[in-house]
Amino acid sequence: MEIDHTCRISAVLVRTVKGLGRLPLPLLHAVGGCLGRLAYVCSAGLRRKTRNNLKTAGLYSRRLAWSSAAAAGKAAIESAYVWFRPDADLLARRGHEAMTRLAQETLARQAAGDNRGLIILTPHIGCFEMGARAYGLTAPITVLYKAPRHPVMHRLLRAGRSQTGVTPVPADTSGVRALLRALKRGEAVGILPDQVPSAGDGLWADFFGRPAFTMTLPLRLAQKTGARVCLMAVWRQADGRGWEVEVEDLEGSPDPATLNARIETLVRRRPEQYVWNYNRYKVPAGMTPPARNPEVNMAMGCIPPVHPESGG
């Protein structure tokens, strides 16, 4: 009975979110911005987390905290548009072109016999849901996701991300195997590199000067497959005009320190579009943050920061 009840609630929620996805993007952004600010005003915990993260980065101002709250609301509600809008509508909207070119390059390499695959790393910046969705319109992509605890939200997430060309897989052993298989076929995989991994799946590396437990999965996948690695940001444009996709090849090893340094560079370009209310400095069960001493950090597996070249 409980399973049937969960299924019914999930079905209603999916239909509701699909209905939201039919609304114009400018309207969704306007509503999302208002809801994001309302949540910021009503939730002391949300305000505290946002302010603390901004202060850690040395970027705090009331104006930036307020605008980032609006951006977080837009990111949440625009997912309905990205997930459930017809493919043709997304192709008509600005922002898919860079992903289309990237997918075409991958297909061309496959046709030439180069099956090393592509690892796309998309931090919690702007409309990060749009990257895989746009890529999947041209070529297949397998994306890793962390399953929400609530089964209703889990069903919604899977329904939303299971769109044309996109295969979502859970962040567990089976999901990692699926990523490896996709890369060995010469296909693309998508990962949120600033998502806090479980103990044993990451290393400590500085993020805005503070140790953050950072996943080593991109590094392991790249070492096993020789795949091309790129970092992507999907910037939200004003007034609901669409998105601007920025793709950078990540030369060398995608180790945690390099990843965090490159993500920092991206965030500083448009800090209001980073999800500052995300608990990036969460300490996984069984882990202890390293002492602020370089020798102790190295002994504990904390990688010192790597500062990228000027201009990223």
Regions found by a protein language model. Give the residues of each.
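Catalytic core of membrane glycerolipid acyltransferases/transacylases, capturing the structured
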Residues: 116-173, 199-206, 236
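Short Gly/charged-rich anion-binding patches and loops
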Residues: 15, 49, 130, 156, ...
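Short, flexible loop segments at the rims of nucleotide/cofactor-binding pockets, characterized by
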Residues: 89-98, 146, 165-171, 207-209, ...
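Short amphipathic alpha-helical segments and helix-helix/interface helices
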Residues: 103-109, 132-133, 157-158, 179-180, ...
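Active-site metal-coordination segments of metallo-dependent hydrolases
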Residues: 48-49, 147-151, 211-215
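Membrane-anchoring hydrophobic helices of lipid-metabolizing enzymes
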Residues: 1-122, 154-158, 163-165
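Non-catalytic C-terminal accessory region of glycerolipid acyltransferases
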Residues: 2, 63-69, 112-114, 137-140, ...
